[in-house]
């Protein structure tokens, strides 16, 4: 598998996870962003920070209470970053950012 194919496969996995979580939880990321108005970006940073700290704990060998690997955490972190970019793009399109 080439690097491009591997990259595409990982992004497809992230997209699949995004769709499944949106089905289960609704569009909670966007809803939370909207609820906090001008602090939407702060809420996103808080969620990203939570994942970052989970990643730090996993790299230190701390046993997680939930079955989440370093790979899973990195994929979640990537998805949160993409969701943040999507919200920023919406705000820019609406002239708010």
Question: What label would you give each PLM region?
Answer:
Residues 1-97:
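Intrinsically disordered, low-complexity regulatory regions
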């Amino acid at each position: 598998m080439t690097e491009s194919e591997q990259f595409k496969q990982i992004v497809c996995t992230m997209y699949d996870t995004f769709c499944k979580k949106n089905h289960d939880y609704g569009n909670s990321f966007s809803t939370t962003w909207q609820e906090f108005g001008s602090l939407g970006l702060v809420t996103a940073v808080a969620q990203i920070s939570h994942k970052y700290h989970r990643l730090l704990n996993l790299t230190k060998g701390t046993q997680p209470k939930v079955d989440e690997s370093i790979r899973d955490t990195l994929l979640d972190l990537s998805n949160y970053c993409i969701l943040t970019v999507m919200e920023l793009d919406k705000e820019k399109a609406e002239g708010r950012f």
